[in-house]
Amino acid sequence: MNTIFTCAGAYGVAKQTYHCAGHKAHGTINMADALRQSCNIYYIQLGQRVGSQQFHNYFDAFGFTERTGVDLPSETGLMKYYSANQLGEVQLASSAFGQAMAITPLQMCTAVAAAVNGGYLVTPHVVDKITDTNGNVVEEIGTNIRRQVISESTSDVIRQMMEYEVGNGTGGGKNAYVSGYRIGGKSGTSEQLNMHRRADGDYKKVASFAAVLPADDPEILVYVMLDDPNNARTDYSSILAAPVAGNIISEVAPYLGIATDGEDRSQTTVTVPNLISTEWSNAQVQLNIQGLKHQLQESQSSQSAA
């Protein structure tokens, strides 16, 4: 998670030039900050390092190439994506930051759940049990774990990065923040795969936001997807979809009995972790997750030793 790439605002792959939103240059950043700032160019370079085969292996493992198996009729099987041998330079670059594919909202939910629940891809169900008129349990649906996609330690880091996105106060997920709750989230703004254009000539968009609560041990997942939102100001999901997710959480969490801890994390005091003897790259990740600005200063003794 401490992999670092440089974003100059534009990045060329074959004959295609990619940009971050507003052509913004994010500079040299790690994964936590790339997630928070939705840096397309970071993830293009990460995809190039991973390679087409490994990228597709994880795409498949997270369930994007198959039905979820939900207990509802007529689940679509018409997913669109590039297979490993179809992932050329441009296809891999586009896929690496979440475009060039068509997946269902339920597929996205099961994948996000796997990312934060310890790494397990689970079959979704409409209900968890069936009772009779007297309240006696007739059938327990149970949990069907299909496979483990990532390790529990990797899942823990993802939860921390998603909480950093919402609670840091500067990330795309800040508009999903609800006082007193530990919320993790990620925004997603993408062009629709059918490439249909609006009247103004721009491509139609999908604005989405995934939120989990509590961030350290998620019990609920909220996924908001807006199909080509008609908003004159913006189509960014951080502005349009994230507040909707926050509103849903503010209503659903009390109903489900998820208590607040009374802490306002938008202005919270952060305890600096003990990073003595920690490698600089690992220390950067931990500091970034907590939203702490930092700078490396070599001591006189270390300079002499070098």
For the regions a language model picked out, list residue spans one by one.
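Beta-lactam-recognizing serine transpeptidase/beta-lactamase-like catalytic domain environment
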Residues: 1-226, 296
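Ligand-recognition elements built from short beta-strands and adjacent flexible loops
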Residues: 180, 194, 224-306
